[in-house]
Amino acid sequence: MVDVGTISLHRGRANLVDLAGAFKVVIDRTVISSILTRESKAFDVPPGRHFLHLRFLGRQSKEIEVLVSPGEEECFTCRTAWYGWPVLTPA
């Protein structure tokens, strides 16, 4: 029986602002990892409601509420907007 779900992130190719470094990945208001350009990461989480956002160069993306079911994967892409703010969107 599967008792976890997964939140997956993919960060595509870089623009000039992206070259400044890694995004911090925040799930449930805790920094759990970082993600570099052209990197993918997956995080096992308990089923239920979670809150996801990114931090980059002192800026924060909009917080997204994610409902994760057991055995399911919720996928997102991350990038920077042209003005440098991190952006998180469903894949």
What are these regions (language model features)?
Residues M1-A91:
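Short loop/turn and low-complexity linker motifs enriched in small/turn-promoting residues
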